[in-house]
């Protein structure tokens, strides 16, 4: 996904396949000249500098940035390059190093970290993928059908466990008081819910009956993507691949810090694996370096942020504002 954001091709292929890209094909034959030119010049490298060098030497700007970072004393980036389990800089943080982390606006990190370790999957993406494949049988279609059926049964179970009250139903979300005949159990049985109301069910245990068929989609989906790089449905199925990958990776991390949320809306079922407490994951990421300083103008109370960020032994320092009080001014408008 990041590759596509950095892509300098006028019509970049959505799959970002090296064999189809002139900037990626033969990359290592040209990267040394690009690095030499950059390192002999300015001491800082922004996106424009990377794009310019990438065009000049016909190399992928995304990979160029990664290789260049190993020659830099300071790397400035978004939280996810350290904390996100999918896109963190593996060349630096898959093992410990002599790094110093400076985390600005750290009051935003708890919510960002929860989002990074959580995942969401919608049943409709399976239905749309089957439709995009068209007619004919294939291993991928079989896997998609099995996963779609499992989520369909989960939707029925969800509605039966937590029927939506008709007073809260609108035209976009038809009444779901029952999708099954009375006293008929759904084909898929969900774990005992923590909470169930209005077509939403929360579970402590991950729903293995849904995750197993989603895992089974991965191999045939990857095979199809590799075999059909120019297919019209390639971009759509690539997004499905990422979504399946996200939810199955979240399932691998799933422990007592997570809950599962299932929500039925009309024909849709939304499966979410929600990380409620990211503290152990943030702590593990910070442990990849020698030390860390997390700072913000609103990082209070410190005891709360120590808890949610896993920094139980961290020292807290509060400083007075560097701005004179006379610089503050509050104006209340008069509204007639």
Segments and roles (model prediction):
Residues 82, 108, 300:
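Residues immediately C-terminal
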Residues 72, 79-80, 105-107, 113:
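Conserved Walker B
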Residues 3-4, 8-11, 325, 329-335:
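Residue-level detector of conserved catalytic or cofactor/ligand-binding positions
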Residues 1-75, 83, 131, 152-155, ...:
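A substrate-engagement module of RecA-like helicase motors
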Residues 53-70, 85-92, 223-330:
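A contiguous, basic/glycine-rich beta-loop/short-helix subdomain that forms a polymer-engagement track
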């Amino acid at each position: 996904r990041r590759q596509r954001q950095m892509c300098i091709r006028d019509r970049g292929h959505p799959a970002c396949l090296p064999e189809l890209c002139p900037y990626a094909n033969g990359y290592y034959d040209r990267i040394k000249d690009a690095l030499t030119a950059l390192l002999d010049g300015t001491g800082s490298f922004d996106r424009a500098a990377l794009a310019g060098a990438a065009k000049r030497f016909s190399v992928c700007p995304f990979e160029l940035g990664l290789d260049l970072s190993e020659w830099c004393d300071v790397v400035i980036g978004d939280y996810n390059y350290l904390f996100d389990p999918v896109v963190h800089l593996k060349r630096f943080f898959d093992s410990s190093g002599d790094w110093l982390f400076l985390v600005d606006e750290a009051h935003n990190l708890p919510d960002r970290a929860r989002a990074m370790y959580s995942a969401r999957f919608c049943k409709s993406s399976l239905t749309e993928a089957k439709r995009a494949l068209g007619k004919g049988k294939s291993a991928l279609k079989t896997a998609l059908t099995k996963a779609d059926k499992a989520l369909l049964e989960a939707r029925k179970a969800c509605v039966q466990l937590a029927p939506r009250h008709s007073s809260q139903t609108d035209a976009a979300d038809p009444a779901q008081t029952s999708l099954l005949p009375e006293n008929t159990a759904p084909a898929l049985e969900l774990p005992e819910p923590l909470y169930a109301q209005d077509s939403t069910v929360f579970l402590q245990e991950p729903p293995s009956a849904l995750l197993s068929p989603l895992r089974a989609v991965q191999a045939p989906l990857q095979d199809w993507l590799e075999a059909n790089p120019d297919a019209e449905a390639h971009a759509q199925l690539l997004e499905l691949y990422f979504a399946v990958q996200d939810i199955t990776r979240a399932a691998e991390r799933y422990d007592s810090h997570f809950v599962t949320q299932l929500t039925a809306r009309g024909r849709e079922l939304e499966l979410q694996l929600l990380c409620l407490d990211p503290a152990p994951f943030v702590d593990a990421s910070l442990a990849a370096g020698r030390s860390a300083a997390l700072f913000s103008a609103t990082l209070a109370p410190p005891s709360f942020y120590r808890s949610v960020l896993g920094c139980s032994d961290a020292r807290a320092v509060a400083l007075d504002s560097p701005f004179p009080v006379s610089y503050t001014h509050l104006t209340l408008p008069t509204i007639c």
